[in-house]
Curated annotation (Swiss-Prot):
Organism annotation: Debaryomyces hansenii (strain ATCC 36239 / CBS 767 / BCRC 21394 / JCM 1990 / NBRC 0083 / IGC 2968) (Yeast)
Keywords, ordered alphabetically: Activator, Nucleus, Transcription, Transcription regulation
Lineage: Eukaryota, Fungi, Dikarya, Ascomycota, Saccharomycotina
Covalent S-S links between cysteines: none
Name of this protein: Mediator of RNA polymerase II transcription subunit 18
Extent of Basic and acidic residues compositional bias: 163-211
GO cellular component, one term: core mediator complex
Span list, region Disordered: 139-216
Pfam families in the record: Med18
Compartment annotation: Nucleus
Purpose of the protein: Component of the Mediator complex, a coactivator involved in the regulated transcription of nearly all RNA polymerase II-dependent genes. Mediator functions as a bridge to convey information from gene-specific regulatory proteins to the basal RNA polymerase II transcription machinery. Mediator is recruited to promoters by direct interactions with regulatory proteins and serves as a scaffold for the assembly of a functional preinitiation complex with RNA polymerase II and the general transcription factors.
Length: 341
């Protein structure tokens, strides 16, 4: 948990080189730290509506959660911020993340409270709760034992044996009748008797064959491959993905102040892309850079550090006033609480 103090601004693409040069001279960093992130915006799928009672404060609320990881494919590494992104001339294709190619990936899950309200606020102040986990994409082998249906075969064998028995009985009866009728059909009686013995042997062979089939149970192994995806983890956690975006920019450090200049990209579904690729477009087609300056304070109750951080941000605001205008963002747009109507 951190208490974050922040100011935001924007700068046109034509002033990007001038802004970078000024910040390099201010911070002394000739090579700023690159920013290349991919963010999932999630929402709880279980609706929670607390019962409001007079005289009681309901502090249990649901929040949207952001899941942030690195954007480190070939497109993200070779992207040039100094070149403008033209709508029809620039193709930005990124790799799909959840294909199971990466074995390991770090995710930072963030939930932020609404900024503090007040007329005399010099900067935006809000509490951010975050946790970082390491997720491994693994292949899980699910083996299901499927037992073959032997009952149908055994029933058929039993029916065959019954038919053999009936035939034997009929043949024996016919043999007795032939024997009692006279000597003229004695030869035919012997033939019937011989056929009865052959039928008896075939019946015993069928019986042994059916017993062998009953004793041997055929088992088949059906192997199903599934990937232990991060999306499945979010589903088990109780969250659904509702949006996603990509960020590309640079980061400067001035004392305890972090200065970020970046562009935001979203998915472009209007144009077709390859099967394993996602086409991106700028969230702001005017190629405007977003600027965010912030200081993280360990505790929201540390008044001394909060006052010192506010003074540092105001000094930076005064120093850069002729280049960029740092201001307080609208707190209502930073409210991440889930409201159900």
């Amino acid at each position: 948990m951190v208490h974050q103090l922040s100011l935001v601004s924007m700068v046109s693409h034509s002033n990007y080189v001038q802004t970078i040069s000024t910040l390099q001279a201010l911070t002394g960093l000739l090579t700023p730290q690159p920013i290349s992130t991919y963010t999932l915006v999630t929402k709880p799928h279980d609706v929670f509506k607390p019962k409001f009672e007079p005289g009681k404060v309901n502090q249990i609320e649901q929040f949207y959660m952001r899941c942030v990881t690195t954007w480190n494919d070939e497109t993200g590494n070779k992207f040039d911020l100094a070149s403008p992104v033209l709508e029809n001339d620039t193709d930005i294709l990124v790799n799909r993340l959840f294909l199971g190619v990466d074995d390991r990936r770090n995710w930072t899950m963030q939930i932020s409270d609404i900024p503090i309200a007040g007329k005399n606020q010099a900067c935006s102040a809000q509490t951010i709760y975050e946790s970082t986990l390491v997720h491994h994409h693994t292949k899980v082998m699910d083996k299901e034992k499927v037992q073959s249906d032997v009952s149908n075969e055994s029933n058929m064998d039993i029916d065959d044996k019954d038919e053999d028995k009936k035939e034997n009985i009929k043949k024996e009866e016919s043999g007795e009748e032939v024997k009692g009728s006279g000597e003229e059909v004695k030869g035919s009686g012997e033939e019937v008797k011989g056929s009865g013995e052959e039928a008896k042997k075939s019946g015993e062979e069928a019986k042994e064959h059916s017993e062998g089939n009953a004793s041997q149970t055929v088992k088949e192994l059906v192997v199903l491959n599934r990937r232990d995806s991060f999306l499945q983890f979010l589903e088990d956690l109780g969250y659904d993905v509702i949006n996603q975006f990509w960020m590309k920019g640079v980061r400067f450090f001035h004392g305890d102040i972090v200065i970020e200049i970046f562009k935001v990209f979203v998915r472009d579904d209007e144009k077709d892309a390859e099967k394993d690729k996602i086409r991106l477009k700028l969230l702001d087609p005017s190629n405007t850079f977003q600027i965010r300056t912030y200081i993280n304070v360990p505790k929201s109750t540390d008044v001394e550090l909060i006052n010192q951080g506010t003074k540092d941000l105001l000094k930076l605001q005064e120093f850069l006033k002729n280049l960029i205008k740092l201001e307080i963002p609208d707190r209502m747009f930073m409210d991440s609480r889930v409201t159900y109507k």
